[in-house]
Amino acid sequence: MEKRKEKRKVDMAAGRQVWRPGNMLYPLPAVMVSAADKAGNANILTVAWTGTVCSDPAMLYISVRPERYTYHMIRETGEFVVNLTTERLAYATDWCGVRSGRDVDKWKEMALTKGAADQLVYAPVILESPVNIECRVTEVKELGSHHMFLAEVAAVQVDERYMKKGGKFELNSTGLLAYSHGEYLGLGKELGKFGWSVKKRK
């Protein structure tokens, strides 16, 4: 007996399309992840599959393909640094994502500077980045095409040039970079502040 086709829930005449399952969660931060092995070989990997997973303790994740050069550095040491990127770093961000550290020295080619991490032993920070998030891996989830590194934040370094009087860090003045569906974008103008939708008008 022929199976009856399920009735579509989406009204195709309403101008909607249904695609096969895929990742369309955009925009995302395009970050440069720095890591090193125990022999001191350091590399940079561009990652968009990243985000916050917990506020307390502060935790984040990155998802990396096992064939990437940096992957085995992170597995060996359990360390990596998430370096936020800016519009000035857009070219280097893309380049470090399409070149392999097996073939080139990304630090040298992109004129990026290694800095010492505060709490990590092996992974360096990128000094040209306005924010360096030092991470220790707590768990690795082998999901499929990518393996997810869950990590606790060990320390955060910030560029003092963006510190204002009173100790406020002007993160949104750094020219942060975003990634959306194959394109790099600036963040644009501020549309509101957290909680503004329920704030009482004066």
Give the ranges of each region predicted by the language model:
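Basic, polyanion-binding surface patches
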Residues: 1-202
